[in-house]
Amino acid sequence: MSDPIKTALSLVPMVIEQTNRGERAYDIFSRLLKERIIFINGPVEDGMAMLVCAQLLFLEAENPKKEISLYINSPGGVVTSGMAIYDTMQFIRPPVSTLCMGQAASMGSLLLTAGAKGHRFTLPNARIMVHQPSGGFQGQASDIERHAQDIIKMKQRLNEIYVQHTGQNYDVIERTLDRDHFMTAEEAKQFGLVDDVIQYRAETEKEEKD
């Protein structure tokens, strides 16, 4: 069975832009990158993390003060890959605005709440899910024990990150993330994962004057 994400990417539309040097063709994601929009779509893994981090660093180099928009529709994925994106978001100078469309689950929810304070949004019918990290190991008993200790440390670190960005106390975060916990957009706002639920794009000053 073919990968639906790869199938979708093979059908990415091209857009034509008129410039004083003539016409130039972009795939739609490259054109949106010019507008400082980055997509996290699908499972979070090393390949995606590499591309997202590279785009964040490029946009910082292009303009270290202008906001970057991160659109998220992800079921989550590899913790270390997600942490690479998270650390890069915190490391760069431009503020990163996040918006959930569809779902932000597991590492997707952590990246959603990691946006700049006051700039974390979700669309009204999006779904957010938080839980503790999971993993499976095999091998010698001593190695399994070390892996178990490591995942417990990772769980504690993830809990601390959620505490930092939501304002909830540690016990609430630990209890909420103990099992898969699904939230509506409004519930995610009340919990502190996002700052607002938006249904319509706000008008720009130019549109208001027109």
Swiss-Prot record:
Presence of keyword Transferase: no
Where is the major localization of this protein?
Answer: cytoplasm
GO terms classed as biological process: protein quality control for misfolded or incompletely synthesized proteins
Entry annotation: catalytic residues: 106 (nucleophile), 131
Broad enzyme group? hydrolase
Q: Name one Pfam family in it.
A: CLP_protease
Tell me where in or outside the cell this protein is found: Cytoplasm
InterPro entries (UniProt xref): ClpP, ClpP/crotonase-like_dom_sf, ClpP/TepA, ClpP_His_AS, ClpP_Ser_AS
Gene Ontology cellular component terms for the protein in this record: cytoplasm; endopeptidase Clp complex
Q: Which domain of life is it from?
A: Bacteria
Q: Does the keyword Cytoplasm apply?
A: yes
User: Which E.C. number(s) belong to this protein?
Assistant: 3.4.21.92
Q: Which UniProt keywords apply?
A: Cytoplasm, Hydrolase, Protease, Serine protease
Q: Which GO terms describe its molecular function?
A: ATP-dependent peptidase activity; ATPase binding; serine-type endopeptidase activity
According to UniProt, the reaction catalysed is: Hydrolysis of proteins to small peptides in the presence of ATP and magnesium. alpha-casein is the usual test substrate. In the absence of ATP, only oligopeptides shorter than five residues are hydrolyzed (such as succinyl-Leu-Tyr-|-NHMec, and Leu-Tyr-Leu-|-Tyr-Trp, in which cleavage of the -Tyr-|-Leu- and -Tyr-|-Trp bonds also occurs)
Similarity annotation: Belongs to the peptidase S14 family.
Its annotated function is as follows: Cleaves peptides in various proteins in a process that requires ATP hydrolysis. Has a chymotrypsin-like activity. Plays a major role in the degradation of misfolded proteins.
Subunit-structure text: Fourteen ClpP subunits assemble into 2 heptameric rings which stack back to back to give a disk-like structure with a central cavity, resembling the structure of eukaryotic proteasomes.
Which protein, by its recorded name, is this? ATP-dependent Clp protease proteolytic subunit
Naturally occurring in which organism (per UniProt): Bartonella henselae (strain ATCC 49882 / DSM 28221 / CCUG 30454 / Houston 1)
